[in-house]
Amino acid sequence: MSSVPKRAKLDGAPADGNTSAAAGNNEEESEALEQIDACQNEIDALNEKASEEILKVEQKYNKLRKPCYEKRSELVKRIPNFWVTSFINHPQVSGILDEEEEECLHALNKLEVEEFEDIKSGYRINFHFDENPYFENKVLTKEFHLNSAAASENGDWPASTSTPIKWKEGKNLLKLLLTKPYGNKKKRNSEYKTFFDWFSDNTDPVNDEIAELIKDDLWPNPLQYYLVPDIEVEPEDEEDNEDNDEEAFDDEDGEDGEGEEEEEDEDDK
């Protein structure tokens, strides 16, 4: 039972006539608190049961969705650059894509998210690649083990693991991008500098925003991002610079004109 909240003591003892009434009130309050506590226990039990049933329903529909995802994956292969386009058009995921990584991701022919049997325990993200000039791997996988039921091979949880990337000679993007200036045109709204930096990092599996975006947003419906219309981006600040130059030129002319007028006035005098 929940502990009874403390109440401020009243100054002075109650009059003899009120003693029995106060005792009756305390007894009634204690009984009510016991009943409230019993109700709360019942609610908690129902919530727990609901979670278990929701989990079973989710597992059932994960199996039902699987053939649809597989069919979609086969159809996607007929569309060149489907996944890299979806990545580029995603407002958050695009924030960690370097230009050379975009070139690399043109070889991405399939994205796949697999939830573990107990969906609360974790999931894996599989990136399938065609032959490409950057690495030897055909599949790169990042796994998330979020509770003891899905502890990683060394028994740790929460934990995440990533496939070691077999970079081709001179093509290690993690090393190449370390030497590039960080001032890219794209705004970086993430703690990760680049896509492969995110893929290789396993320090905080519980709060991996990019993984959650891929699993819960990009994977269920990539078409909404692939079909985002192209937006023409005007060269940054060119017009503003021209306007500023014109204003500066006008200001100089104005100052020169004022100087000439003052000289003419002095000559007239």
From Swiss-Prot:
Modified residues (Phosphoserine): S30, S148, S152
Domain of life: Eukaryota
Region named Disordered: 1-33, 227-269
One GO CC term on file: chromatin
Compositionally biased spans, kind Acidic residues: 231-269
GO function terms (MF aspect): chromatin binding; histone binding
Family: Belongs to the nucleosome assembly protein (NAP) family.
The protein's name in its UniProt record: Protein SET
